[in-house]
UniProtKB/Swiss-Prot annotation:
Purpose of the protein: Component of the molecular motor that translocates viral genomic DNA in empty capsid during DNA packaging. Forms a tripartite terminase complex together with TRM2 and TRM3 in the host cytoplasm. Once the complex reaches the host nucleus, it interacts with the capsid portal vertex. This portal forms a ring in which genomic DNA is translocated into the capsid. TRM1 carries an endonuclease activity that plays an important role for the cleavage of concatemeric viral DNA into unit length genomes.
Annotated organism of origin: Human herpesvirus 8 type P (isolate GK18) (HHV-8)
Family: Belongs to the herpesviridae TRM1 protein family.
UniProt protein name: Tripartite terminase subunit 1
Residues annotated as binding ATP: Y621, N622, R623, T624, W625, E626, R627, E628
One Pfam family per UniProt: PRTP
The UniProt record lists the keyword Transit peptide: no
Keywords annotated in UniProt: ATP-binding, Host nucleus, Late protein, Metal-binding, Nucleotide-binding, Viral genome packaging, Viral release from host cell, Zinc, Zinc-finger
Cellular compartments per GO CC: host cell nucleus
Lineage: Viruses, Duplodnaviria, Heunggongvirae, Peploviricota, Herviviricetes
Name of the gene encoding the protein in the UniProt record: TRM1
Length: 695
């Protein structure tokens, strides 16, 4: 079924991409007949597939099925809107305003979640990152909310995600931020060597590439110029050559001449001193070649880029005449063209955002390098090229001079000393020159690194990104967890949660038997890991070939949710080596997993106490009566869900995290719901004795 679903998703997403492009095209160029035919075919698919897909997602979902449901809804709405706009014969400005410039904003949502203990959360959503952060936090407290309330709230959150998804594979730049790490970023950081650095210090420097995945776009510069050449049209002049570019070409020519001079040398040949000198100069100058690109220049790279953009727009008139069209088409970017400042953030039609960032970097470096100190540093750095020119022009090298010469300064070749005033002044001046050179050289390197780093940040922020799979995968994992809980407790189990004197006496018998027992220290350590495993959220449970230990998985779950250190300390102190039954056994009868009105912090701690009691009491019960009762979680996608009496379920004690039916004892095809742990243990003892007697 997954293959068929993926095939449908591929076709629907391709249609969504085409429809997204058509919504920005000149309405006069649209084929209304083909559009109407496509709309009819899609409505047939929409009416057949969408109801079945919703039923499937209400039973068990995947990231692919959730996204496909949203695409079907959004494409249907977009086709209807585009059909209405084309039928009304609007002007291009009115057409695009109706499609894209609607003043109503639907990118904000408030969702209410009702937890146990009558504690409610009013969730404010604006970005995709808000949804992902909430998923991680809900995963860390999944045992504090009922499945019904969780599914109701998750439905609202998914509808909000569907609105953000739209039909474009490119999310809007106002829908996400890339400097907030997601759960996948945390997993990657945990696998990299940290050299003693904490996760809190490493995660802020992480640029998330999972929620919205960076895409390597096709180069735009030169693409349309090549199309004009193929049509036989004269292309506009390229970006004018500047003195900076002339110098760069000159430096490149020197480098190529140097490589030609040593090109005749091979591995079996003799290494002459001239070849060795040229090779060393080429090597040592290669690390600084990028810093010499932006010296003195007369015009801005950004100005040249904008000029080229304007020239290419003018050539569209010639292109329209060549194709026999009446005037140029009026697409969206013709009616609402961005100004120069907006182009810095969105790029142009004939240049990409990467081209804009590169030009901005060059202009910034030019402004810095025009300072006197950095100009001197550049000149000294270009001595490599000067020496290469002399070596190639002279024909014969002065080997002794070239191997020892490093600076023409006379002060570097004479010793400074003596007590005469002029010698002391000369020494001070020499030291001042060396200090200024060092400061200029270090500052030059720091400026280059800073410009490069800021350019990388701009590329990460403004670069092309596509919708990732993280949001839908996390949504499906949480949705399935609560769906399975709701489906499991809805099975025809026998309800034994009502107060009964017999079960009360049975509960007292088990408690009195456990009070005089004790767990070993080595046993407590194993049970602590089992406790950690039960309170680990569904998003942090990974089924891999090399699973992490339960304590590591729980730590990652809490770290992803942003839990504070004192809260983590409380978890670690729930079970200690010398713990005794009186420390965890609750005296109340039939009150297991019941919560009073309190906030989420007390709810969470109370849930930990219940789960601790379950783990330790069951273990002590097994040890005392030599039983093998296992603690299990609600199964995922069990084939027995549709049967009157479920088959194929493992015998054991199921923890559902539901206040109405927290404990379910399953034996073969039968099951019983309990609200008292020790009454359940007595019932299991009777069942096991009965089974042993039959054997």
């Amino acid at each position: 079924m997954a293959k068929e679903l993926a095939a449908v998703y591929a076709d629907v997403s391709a249609l969504a991409m085409d429809l997204c492009l058509l919504s920005y095209a000149d309405p006069a160029t649209l084929d209304t007949k083909s559009l109407a035919l496509t709309t009819g075919k899609f409505q047939s698919l929409h009416g057949t597939l969408l109801p079945l897909l919703r039923r499937q997602n209400a039973h068990e979902c995947s990231g692919l099925s959730l996204e496909l449901e949203h695409l079907l809804e959004n494409v249907a709405d977009a086709l209807t809107t585009l059909g209405v706009c084309t039928s009304r014969k609007l002007s291009p400005e009115e057409h695009f305003s109706l499609l894209h410039l609607d003043i109503t904003c639907n990118k904000h949502r408030s969702v209410r979640f009702n937890f146990y203990g009558n504690w409610a959360l009013e969730l404010k959503l604006s970005l995709i990152n808000d949804v992902e952060i909430f998923f991680k936090r809900l995963s860390s407290v999944f045992y504090c909310i009922g499945s019904g309330s969780a599914l109701e709230g998750l439905g609202e959150v998914l509808r909000f995600v569907g609105k953000l998804r739209g039909i474009s594979p490119v999310p809007g730049p106002d829908l996400y931020v890339s400097n907030l790490p997601c759960l996948e970023c945390l997993q990657e950081v945990c696998l990299t060597p940290n050299q003693g650095t904490s996760l809190q210090a490493m995660l802020p420097d992480t640029a998330c590439s999972h929620i919205c995945t960076p895409a390597c776009g096709e180069p735009v510069r030169g693409l349309f110029e090549n199309e004009l050449k193929q049509l036989g049209l004269q292309t506009p002049e390229s970006i004018p050559t500047t003195p900076c570019q002339s110098r760069v070409r000159q430096d490149d020519e020197i480098r190529q001449s140097s490589l030609m001079a040593v090109g005749d040398h091979h591995i079996f040949g003799e290494v002459t001193r001239s070849v060795l000198e040229i090779s060393n100069l080429i090597y040592w100058s290669s690390g600084h070649s990028d810093a010499t690109c932006d010296g003195d220049r007369d015009c801005s790279h950004l100005a040249s880029l904008f000029t080229h953009e304007a020239d290419m727009h003018k050539r569209r008139v010639d292109l329209a005449g060549c194709l026999g069209e009446r005037g140029t088409p009026k697409h969206f970017f013709d009616c609402f063209r961005p100004d120069s400042l907006e182009t810095l953030f969105c790029g142009g039609l004939f240049s990409s955002v990467e081209d804009t960032i590169e030009s901005l970097q060059k202009d910034c470096s030019s402004a810095f390098y025009q300072q006197v100190n950095y100009t001197t540093a550049l000149q000294k750095q270009n001595e490599f090229y000067v020496r290469l020119s002399k070596l190639l022009a002279a024909g014969q090298l002065n080997l002794g001079k070239c191997s020892t010469e490093s600076c023409p300064s006379e002060a570097r070749r004479q010793l400074v000393g003596g007590d005469k005033p002029e010698e002391v002044l000369r020494d001070a001046k020499h030291r001042q020159e060396l200090y200024l050179q060092k400061v200029a050289r270090d500052g030059f390197k720091k400026l280059s690194d800073c410009i490069r780093h800021q350019g990388h940040i701009l590329s990460q922020t403004l670069g092309l990104r596509l919708w990732g799979s993280v949001i839908y995968n996390e949504a499906s994992a949480l949705q399935n967890h609560f769906l399975h809980r709701a489906q499991f407790i809805s099975l025809p189990w026998q309800d034994l949660t009502v107060d009964c004197p017999t079960r009360f006496e049975n509960s007292k018998y088990i408690k009195n038997s456990l009070y005089c027992q004790r767990l070993g220290r080595e046993h407590v350590e194993i049970l602590t890991l089992e406790f950690y495993k039960l309170i680990t959220g569904p998003l942090s449970k990974r089924h891999t070939l090399f699973p992490s230990p339960p304590n590591v998985t729980l730590a990652q779950c809490f770290e992803a949710a942003g839990m504070l250190p004192h809260q983590k300390m409380m978890v670690s102190e729930m079970i200690w080596p010398s713990i005794e039954p009186k420390d965890w056994i609750e005296p109340n009868f039939n009150q297991f997993y019941s919560f009073e009105n309190q906030d989420i912090n007390h709810l969470q701690k109370r849930a930990w106490e219940y789960i601790r009691e379950l783990v330790l009491s069951v273990s002590l019960y097994n040890r005392t009566w030599e039983r093998e009762l296992k603690i299990l979680l609600t199964p995922q996608g069990s084939p027995g869900f549709k049967e009157p009496k479920p088959a194929g379920l493992t015998t054991g004690l199921y923890l559902t995290f539901e206040t109405s039916a927290p404990l379910v004892l399953v034996d073969k095809k039968y099951g019983w719901i309990f609200k008292d742990l020790y009454a359940l243990l007595y019932h299991h003892l009777q069942l096991s004795n009965h089974n042993d007697s039959q054997v």
